[in-house]
């Protein structure tokens, strides 16, 4: 809550008219007072003094995860509890998209063909839309 370079950046942002936010774990921390949108998560003292990766760091990560998840939902990237418009930037996400597609569309059982469709379309939702618009696709 008192790191000088963070306080300096917050001040520069304020001078430039850039809105700022922060997540802090100490009530009324200077950083929270300097930010436009502070989030104070009072976790109390750490079990091991000086080890902020425990309660404080974990609580901040949870807050960031909640914000990120909420944004994904608001942007229409989630249907039910499935991420259907994720950017497929690695093998894990491609595999997950294939499994989600096959779960949502059980008539498609050939994993490799589903994978080709997912890669062509770019997401689960776009693959489903592509199938609806082109009934002659070989899948």
What are these regions (language model features)?
Residues 1-62, 68-75:
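Glycine-rich phosphate-binding loops that contact phosphosugars or nucleotide phosphates
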Residues 27, 43-45, 87-90, 121-122:
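Glycine-rich beta-alpha junction loops
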Residues 65, 69-105, 111, 118:
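Internal, active-site/partner-interface "lid" segment
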Residues 105-139:
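NTP-binding/hydrolysis catalytic cores, primarily Walker-type P-loop NTPases
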